[in-house]
């Protein structure tokens, strides 16, 4: 993406995603936000188009594209009018499974990733805790080895999106006490396993917005998982987690720009159509100048997001 211009291939990606999103109008998204109905039809359409696997490896059924292309996809979704209801519905599929795809055993990778890409499996990501938000190393969820093999996980997570419909869950838990490791980031492990509702309870959290995609408090009580559920090496989970969380920050930035552009477009249309004292209100500087400033700030934010995407991809490529 030299000079922040999209290549022909990237333009084609954006156009294709926009065509898919055009099938879901404002009434569709308004209804979901009013009733809390998850946008299943939208997710199915994006899965059929192959967009859930945008950044996943080709050998696992993905497109093998980079963060820039994933950023284009997610911005197009948000800008279409789907906003964060649409973006959040598929957001986790884009980079959330990357720790599994990159560090999981060969059997786990080949079992899990194709089913996530196709939409057959619906995963949620259990990271944040009531007393451990950005400070992930302070989490208290524990995974302990069972004498006969496997692990038992206990703990509480919060703000876990999609847990009401998930059949799979990616959990980060402490496997070595914090006081027993050299660095706080050590001793944390990742597990990808079934969402066993006899051992995991998900309680929806009331929110002011984005009602179509619920957030949950998750309670994990003696969840037994096999050794095969461990992603990569024991104690390295925090570092693996960053392969999903860091690029996600870029996606969120681009999604926010997309949502801002959609809002600005509606405001500009209204300013043109609303006539007061014989002329559109957009001809008044008190209306036009704030809209112009909003446009400039959105463009600056967009440049930042699309500068971060290739920079991250370049740094990540050099790290492996």
Segment roles from a protein language model:
Residues 222-240:
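Long, acidic (Asp/Glu-rich), low-complexity accessory segments flanking structured domains
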Residues 150-203:
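A short core secondary-structure module
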Residues 1-81, 90, 103-108, 115, ...:
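Alpha-helical interface subdomain recognition
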């Amino acid at each position: 993406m030299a000079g922040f211009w999209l290549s022909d291939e990237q333009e084609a990606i954006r156009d294709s995603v926009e065509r898919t999103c055009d099938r879901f109008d404002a009434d569709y998204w308004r209804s979901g936000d009013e009733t809390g109905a998850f946008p299943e039809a939208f997710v199915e359409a994006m899965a059929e188009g192959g967009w859930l696997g945008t950044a996943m490896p080709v050998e696992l059924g993905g497109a093998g594209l980079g963060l820039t292309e994933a950023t284009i996809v997610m911005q197009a979704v948000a800008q279409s009018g789907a906003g964060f209801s649409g973006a959040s519905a598929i957001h986790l599929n884009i980079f959330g499974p990357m720790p599994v795809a990159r560090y999981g055993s060969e059997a786990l990778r080949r079992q899990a990733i194709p089913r996530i890409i196709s939409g057959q499996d619906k995963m949620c990501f259990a990271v944040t805790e009531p007393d451990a938000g950005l400070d992930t190393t302070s989490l208290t969820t524990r995974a302990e080895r069972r004498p006969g093999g496997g692990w038992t996980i206990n703990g509480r997570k919060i703000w876990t999106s999609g847990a009401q419909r998930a059949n799979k869950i990616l959990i980060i838990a402490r496997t070595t006490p914090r006081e027993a490791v050299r660095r706080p980031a050590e001793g944390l492990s990742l597990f990808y396993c079934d969402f066993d509702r006899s051992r995991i309870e998900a309680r929806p959290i009331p929110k002011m917005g984005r009602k179509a995609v619920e957030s949950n408090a998750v309670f994990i009580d003696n969840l037994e998982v096999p050794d095969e559920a461990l992603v990569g090496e024991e104690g390295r989970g925090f570092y693996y987690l960053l392969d999903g969380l860091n690029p996600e920050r870029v996606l969120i930035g681009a999604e926010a720009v997309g949502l801002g552009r959609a809002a600005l477009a509606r405001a500009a249309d209204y300013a043109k159509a609303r006539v007061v004292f014989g002329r559109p209100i957009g001809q008044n500087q008190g209306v036009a100048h704030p809209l112009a400033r909003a446009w400039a700030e959105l463009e600056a934010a967009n440049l930042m997001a699309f500068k971060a995407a290739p920079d991250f991809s370049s740094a990540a490529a050099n790290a492996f």
